Regions:
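Expand to "…catalyze enediolate/carbanion chemistry for C-C bond making/breaking, isomerization
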Residues: 1-208
């Protein structure tokens, strides 16, 4: 079974919609060529794309005959830490996705469309855990600044202001955004990394 394509159809923007479908097509072609027997997508509108690709290649019930003998993966490969850059843009992305997902989760929605992707709790968990880790280890950003609580709170405030402007005061007030910000901030700066983001969020639900 292949992985899930998180892309969703983009309304009122043909160019972005074409990009989303192309990403899904490339992803599913890679999977079927690697020997997967099936796959899944985040949105029913993308099922025909995935079905077409797999139906065209699969001639039987499975692809057990397909092997990747030309690929060698070692223990060192599995343990190698990614060496990508750490950026302010990355922090902002974590904040705006994490806060909006928590807000939706508190309102009873588990799968949330954000920035043309269907997100779930795992995305929000990665977002807050990454910021927690950067704070814990005083990570350096690519511009030389150290990630500390002051920097995090400054960027958090900036992103929340941006989000309020986009959503509008009425939507913000009617939603659970203030509580979502509170949960995200508290979990990010905590001395102990919570086991999973939804645990303290669930406590908020049962206590309200």
């Amino acid at each position: 079974m292949g992985g899930m394509a998180a892309q969703i159809p983009v309304k009122n923007n043909d160019e972005e919609n074409d990009k989303a479908f192309e990403k899904v097509r490339n992803d599913k072609e890679r999977e079927v060529n690697n020997g997967h027997d099936g796959t899944w997508v985040a949105h029913p509108g993308l099922v025909p794309v995935a079905m077409e690709i797999f139906d065209n290649q699969l001639s039987g019930d499975n692809q057990l005959d397909v092997s990747l003998d030309n690929v060698t993966i070692t223990q060192d490969d599995l343990l190698e830490v990614h060496k990508g850059q750490r950026t302010e843009e990355g922090m902002r992305e974590c904040i705006k996705v994490g806060v909006q997902y928590i807000e939706a989760w508190l309102a009873g929605r588990g799968a949330v469309p954000l920035y043309n992707l269907m997100e779930d709790a795992a995305t929000a968990e990665i977002s807050r855990a990454q910021i927690w880790q950067w704070l814990k280890h005083a990570t350096k950003l690519d511009d030389g600044r150290t990630v500390n609580e002051e920097l995090f709170k400054d960027i958090l405030t900036s992103e929340i202001d941006n989000l309020k402007n986009v959503l509008g005061d009425d939507v913000w007030a009617k939603g659970k955004y203030e509580k979502a910000v509170e949960i995200f901030e508290k979990m990010s700066i905590s001395q102990v990394c919570e086991e999973f983001l939804t645990l303290p969020a669930y406590e908020e639900i049962v206590s309200s």
